């Protein structure tokens, strides 16, 4: 599925990527926390999410927090690798809670962090299919493009919103057909 793109990026609670490596092997792994942290913080202000990244756009990046987030050990490990809410609670939230900056600046910094971590995983000139709720975060995608020469392609809204359901149906079909439906190289 979606083989016409260099990478498939899903920006949900966590940003994750899948692609075929140089040997033609399918690789998939988590890049970084995304909407899980942003939405959690936005809810403290009565919003479900940062619509179009407007709150982030209104803030300034806190370099100390940005650098601390990017220094986390997970980002220096080779794939396959996977994230979980517990990892965020143990590693990210203490940094966020220790930052006494303005709310918009914290959101700007978390968005910048996600954008940076997303961008650093793509080769220059890549065509990237982007799905998940974060596909609607215009500002995050703008910031990712500032770090790398990448083209984000937005599919039809039903693909953005329901890709995971479609994938699980596809995996079920492969099972019914006695075809492999999981790969060791995918987390």
Where do the language-model regions lie?
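Conserved phosphate-binding catalytic cores of ATP/NTP-utilizing and phosphoryl-transfer enzymes
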Residues: 1-6
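Active-site nucleophile and cofactor-binding loops and adjacent substrate-binding regions
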Residues: 8-10, 31, 131, 155-162
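Conserved phosphate-binding/catalytic loops in two-lobed NTP-binding clefts
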Residues: 146-167
């Amino acid at each position: 599925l979606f083989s016409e793109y260099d990478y498939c990026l899903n920006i949900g609670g966590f940003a994750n990527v899948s692609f075929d490596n140089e040997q033609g092997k399918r690789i998939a792994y988590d890049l970084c926390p995304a909407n899980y942290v942003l939405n959690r913080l936005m809810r403290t202000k009565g919003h479900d999410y940062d619509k179009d990244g407007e709150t982030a756009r209104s803030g300034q990046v806190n370099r100390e927090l940005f650098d601390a987030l990017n220094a986390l050990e997970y980002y220096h490990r080779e794939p396959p690798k996977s994230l979980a809410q517990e990892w965020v609670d143990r590693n990210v939230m203490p940094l966020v809670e220790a930052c006494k900056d303005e709310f918009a600046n914290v959101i700007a910094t978390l968005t910048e962090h996600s954008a940076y971590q997303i961008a650093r995983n793509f080769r220059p000139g890549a065509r990237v299919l982007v799905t998940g709720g974060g596909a609607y975060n215009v500002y995050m995608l703008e910031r990712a493009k500032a770090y790398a020469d990448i083209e984000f392609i937005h599919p039809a809204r039903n693909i953005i919103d329901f890709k995971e359901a479609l994938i699980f149906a596809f995996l079920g079909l492969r099972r019914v057909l006695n075809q492999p439906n999981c790969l060791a190289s995918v987390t």
